[in-house]
């Protein structure tokens, strides 16, 4: 069989396993899902599974990586659109990312519940490093464009990109902390109280982002109130 066909067959089979795993994360939860569940669904042997993934954590990493692939394909073209000014690129990027996550809220929440467990700390760090590598070039180009247009002001576009992406990650961590704390009963807050905490977090991180990029106050919107409520309700 030609090498191209072998590679296509391998990719197709691997994606089939990921499709089943994603479904099981929805229906059973990652912690309850076993490799045997996947074998039973696909009618394959354990050896066949390990041909594609060497462990359950490797499967989780692949699920997140595929989600990152989807995000990259959807959002990088926005950052690279030559017809848009820099600030509009940033605002559209944030708005589209927020809407995209909201459309698959249940899956995001299922991943969130396992993503912040201690045993996945290394995987989390690794995936963020990969995301930084993927997004950074386009993000830096937008910052450089904004500096040329006079809407952004920084002498360090590369470093500003890294700091900006860490701020975005930090905001996501804050949301995760609030959501998971509420689910676990560790934080007894009303929906309105959670909304207000998230609202303040968005305002604070947005302010920090504008300062890092040298943007005027109120020129960047990371997340609106309606989108925040999606994660409170």
Which residue stretches match the model-derived regions?
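Helical hydrophobic small-molecule/effector-binding pocket
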Residues: 88-116, 133-140, 168-176, 211, ...
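Short secondary-structure transition hinges
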Residues: 103-140, 144, 148-151, 157-161, ...
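Helix-turn-helix
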Residues: 16, 24-58, 62-66
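Hydrophobic alpha-helical connector segments
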Residues: 62, 66, 77-107, 158-164, ...
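C-terminal peripheral helix-coil segments that are non-catalytic and often amphipathic
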Residues: 133-149, 167, 173-233
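Amphipathic, non-transmembrane alpha-helical scaffold segments
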Residues: 10, 64, 68, 124-136, ...
């Amino acid at each position: 069989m030609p090498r191209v066909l072998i590679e296509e067959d391998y990719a197709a089979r691997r994606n089939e396993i990921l499709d089943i795993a994603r479904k099981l994360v929805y229906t059973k939860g990652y912690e309850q899902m076993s490799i045997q569940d996947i074998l039973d669904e696909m009618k394959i042997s354990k050896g066949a599974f390990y041909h594609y993934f060497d462990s359950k954590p490797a499967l989780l990493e692949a699920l997140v990586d595929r989600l990152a692939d989807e995000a990259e394909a959807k959002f990088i073209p926005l950052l690279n659109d030559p017809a848009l000014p820099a600030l509009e690129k940033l605002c559209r990027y944030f708005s589209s990312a927020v809407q995209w996550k909201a459309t698959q809220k249940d899956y995001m929440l299922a991943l969130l519940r396992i993503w912040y467990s201690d045993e996945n700390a290394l995987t989390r760090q690794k995936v963020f490093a990969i995301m930084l590598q993927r997004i950074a070039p386009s993000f830096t180009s937008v910052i450089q464009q904004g500096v040329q247009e006079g809407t952004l002001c920084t002498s360090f576009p590369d470093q500003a990109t890294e700091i900006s992406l860490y701020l975005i990650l930090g905001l996501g961590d804050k949301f995760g902390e609030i959501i998971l704390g509420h689910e676990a009963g560790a934080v007894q807050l009303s929906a309105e109280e959670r909304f207000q905490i998230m609202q303040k977090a968005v305002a604070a991180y947005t302010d920090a982002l504008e300062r890092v990029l040298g943007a005027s106050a109120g020129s960047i919107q990371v997340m609106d109130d309606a989108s925040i409520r999606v994660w409170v309700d």
